[in-house]
Design a protein with these regions (language model features):
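Glycine-rich phosphate-binding loop signature in dinucleotide/nucleotide-binding domains
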Residues: 2-3, 89-91, 143-146
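A metal-dependent, Asp-based hydrolase signature
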Residues: 26-78
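Hydrophobic anchor at the start of a short beta-strand
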Residues: 93-94, 150, 170
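Substrate-recognition "cap/lid" segment bordering the active-site pocket of phosphatases
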Residues: 100-151, 157-162
């Protein structure tokens, strides 16, 4: 793949590592933030709650609740086989994740991957998050290449949508 692209960008959780996060517990904690603000959060999923938090003036509290779990889960994360692939890259490598940037960096450090990564963009690094193209475009820009010169490697339909919207080739794992 190195000969086909000038840069490779990876998603983090589910692609390079598996964060030890119980997302159901995270959702419960986020719903508690909504409850404390007097906002009905019934029926919404975690990412919907995250997206609506700003509308209710609780974005920083919701982000803190999610990030706390991600930080702990990054320390206890499990390295996935694809992580070995990035260490052999001869082109610039970045990470673009829906996780917060600090959790990404913790996980990369925990698995001795940080030195191989030239750019890390998490959901809190830019104003929008995947599937908006902005985070991936920011990562590609930090790597010094054009979107058409990069490939995004991820594990979810959201990653594929992000790549398509950014004009970046996609490889699903």
């Amino acid at each position: 793949m190195d000969t086909d692209y000038e840069a490779v960008v990876y998603d983090l959780d589910g692609t390079l590592v598996h964060l030890a996060v119980d997302w159901a517990v995270v959702a419960t904690d986020v719903i508690e933030v909504y409850d404390e603000a007097g906002v009905d959060a019934r029926g919404a999923d975690l990412w919907g709650l995250m997206e609506r938090a700003d509308d209710h003036g609780i974005a920083s509290e919701v982000e803190a609740a999610i990030s706390e779990h991600e930080h702990a889960g990054a320390h206890d994360s499990r390295r996935l086989p694809l992580a070995d692939e990035l260490l052999d890259r001869s082109v610039p490598v970045g990470v673009c994740s829906l996780n917060c940037e600090r959790a990404c960096r913790i996980a990369l450090d925990s698995h001795d991957l940080a030195a191989a990564i030239e750019a890390v963009v998490g959901r809190d690094s830019v104003d929008t998050h995947k599937p908006d193209p902005e985070p991936l475009l920011a990562t590609v820009s930090q790597l010094g290449v054009e979107p058409s010169e990069a490939v995004f490697v991820g594990d979810s339909p959201r990653d594929g949508t992000t790549a398509e919207r950014a004009g970046v080739d996609f490889r699903r794992v």
